[in-house]
Design a protein with these regions (language model features):
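HIT superfamily nucleotide-processing domains
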Residues: 1-155
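Conserved, single-site charged/polar hotspot
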Residues: 151-599
């Protein structure tokens, strides 16, 4: 264990982080479950050991949990590895004749130095048997899952006061900014126009080469303005503008660029986010619900970043490809240099560039510190524009994990109702999509839609049910362009698998040259639109058949977006109907509760 520690540590998963140097990690690539405590001080070492100790199961009749511990010192760092145990001795200890091995693993055995009192056992034991013995006396995977969950809860419960969030604003080889007010750097007051440039692997500022720069505001009113901040990245409204921010400006170097990071209190950040994403006309209860959702997602991201450690940001993409099928899902980008980015890929954050709505400030203050909780963890609170009448479940859009708080519900009273129709069935899905059943999000009320949609999106109000027409030439060219596959002429689009909301997550494209299966829902939406099809909850009708090939196609669909979690249009209507924010949240997030983490 000690010999290979550096390699094991690099592949470990952080469960709890005290600071950049002290943490609790799960050792992942070892023969048996192990938890390591990395510390530099006696105080933190005791604190983290107590967290691990309290997380371990206690057997009936025992006074303390079973474990082995191996500890050593590396320079000024103390490393303690805890091996949670299920039992004292393996079954082979009590076996008879040649089946017996007198092995009773202790701390050194669990750390990789197995001691056998009998020479006959020493000569006969194999690496496979040794591994089996260590696994047998250790906690099971299920028991370890509970231990890990218990340790991770300390990340949340330790937030007795408002946390700080770090937001990546812009990255470039050269950044120009203006300090509007006095900022401290190394005890010196700085103000006015500034330029930093990437040079020789460092930041060049005022003729000095530095690895990082931290500009700390002298007072709460001081702000800084960054030039050339991109908004709407990869969307049709993409552009650059000057944006102004409160809080600390942190400049760091990574991968040949300088990153400008804004560090500020969470509640201040949320006030800007909700003001940017929601209309000033939104009802107070809708704004409260969105404040809780945004805060939940943000704090979950902060915790996720702790487990990722430092490095270059990446997007989570999973692909399953065979000769005749491509199933791919995209999740939000994971940043490791900062907690979240400032663009729509995370949450739209524009500092104090745009006016803050007093209505939003009221909603933020009313829900201060509140998040959605489920099974001891902060909820990954997803949302979309319009569910189409029934919300979708997580596993049909992203990773094949069923999240207990992201279950399918009918978007109507009684709240949180399980769908009465099985929309995974093709006939039922067709009947549902071609009808217009009652739902909170089934509305053309301009006042309600104006709470959720910007002016551009309100040019059409056909979100609950919509149609798209294609010619044969248009559809075959579009699919070839978007997939990179020449199908020839398109003969059919065949739904193979649907989720609980009727959204297709596996679809076969049949052409005159070949057939191919694609998924999940976003991959399907991308293949059938220049940007994104409203949703993958659609049925296909083809007509004007010539030699077995349709000349026209009509897609009739339901909803806008992935449909998982809160339905924004539905939630806006609920607010208009008098439901409060907790009723709205509990309707869309089953098995969750609203909990206040800090005052």
């Amino acid at each position: 264990l000690q010999q290979h520690w550096q390699q094991l540590y690099e592949t470990s998963e952080t469960l709890l982080k005290i600071n950049d140097y002290e943490r609790i990690v799960l050792v992942k690539n070892y023969v048996c479950p192990a938890i390591a405590i990395i510390s530099k001080s006696l105080e933190h070492d005791e604190q983290m050991f107590r967290m691990v100790y309290d997380a371990l199961p206690l057997k009936e009749g025992e006074t303390e949990p079973m474990m082995n511990i191996v500890a050593w010192r590396a320079n000024d760092t103390f490393i303690s590895v805890v091996f949670p145990r299920y039992k004292h001795r393996p079954d082979c200890y009590f076996a008879e004749k040649e089946q017996q091995f007198l092995v009773s693993p202790g701390s050194l055995d669990m750390a990789g130095l197995m001691i056998l009192p009998r020479e006959i056992d020493f000569e006969r034991i194999t690496p496979t048997l040794a591994e089996h013995i260590m696994r047998e006396v250790s906690l099971s995977d299920e028991a370890m899952h509970e231990v890990i969950k218990h340790i991770c809860q300390h990340n949340v419960s330790s937030w007795k006061q408002e946390p700080t969030v770090s937001v990546g604003i812009v990255s470039a080889e050269k950044i120009h900014f203006r300090l509007n007010g006095s900022y401290l750097i190394d005890g010196e007051l700085i103000t006015g126009e500034q330029t930093v440039e990437y040079s020789k692997g460092e930041i060049l500022w005022q003729s000095a080469y530095l690895r990082e720069l931290v500009f700390t505001p002298k007072d709460q009113e001081s702000s800084f303005s960054l030039d050339d901040v991109t908004i709407g990245l990869n969307f049709h409204w993409e552009r650059k503008e000057v944006q102004t921010f409160l809080g600390t400006l942190h400049l760091i170097v990574d991968n040949g660029k300088i990153y400008a990071i804004n560090e500020l209190p969470v509640e201040e950040y949320l006030t800007s986010v909700i003001s940017s994403e929601m209309s000033a006309t939104s009802s107070l209860e809708l704004l409260k619900a969105h404040a809780v959702i945004s805060r939940s997602w943000l704090l979950a991201q902060i915790e996720k970043r702790k487990s990722l450690g430092k490095g270059t940001e990446h997007q989570e993409v999973s692909t399953v490809r065979t000769d005749n099928e491509l199933v791919r899902w995209f999740d939000r980008e994971d940043h490791t240099l900062f907690d979240v980015c400032a663009d729509d890929h995370c949450q739209r954050y524009q500092g104090i560039t745009k006016a803050t709505s007093p209505h939003v400030k009221m909603a933020i203050d009313a829900t201060r510190g509140q998040v959605l909780f489920s099974e001891g963890s902060i909820c990954d609170a997803r949302f979309s524009k319009c569910c189409g009448g029934i919300s979708e479940e997580f596993q049909y859009c992203w990773e094949n994990i069923r999240k207990p708080y992201l279950l399918s519900v009918e978007d109507k009273a009684p709240l949180g109702s399980v769908p009465t129709m099985d929309l995974t069935d093709e006939e039922a899905a067709r009947e549902w999509i071609l009808s217009s059943p009652e739902a909170f999000c089934n509305t053309h009320d301009g006042v309600v839609l104006g709470q959720v949609l910007n002016n551009y999106d309100q040019e059409t109000q056909d979100f609950y049910r919509w149609t798209v027409e294609f010619t044969q030439a248009g559809l075959s060219a579009l699919i070839a362009q978007k997939t990179g596959i020449d199908f020839g002429e398109i003969k059919n689009l065949v739904p193979l698998s649907r989720g609980k909301s009727g959204r297709i997550y596996r679809m076969r494209i049949e052409g005159t040259k070949l057939s191919y299966v694609i998924g999940k829902e976003l991959e399907i939406r991308r293949a059938l639109s220049e940007s994104h099809l409203y949703s993958s909850a659609f049925v296909v009708d083809s007509y004007d058949i010539v030699n077995g090939v349709p000349q026209h196609f009509r897609l009739t669909g339901a909803g806008w977006g992935h449909g998982v979690g809160l339905c924004q249009i539905g939630a806006a209507m609920m607010g208009e109907k008098g439901y409060d924010y907790q009723q709205i949240l509990y309707h869309y997030y089953k098995n969750a509760e609203v909990r206040r983490l800090y005052e």
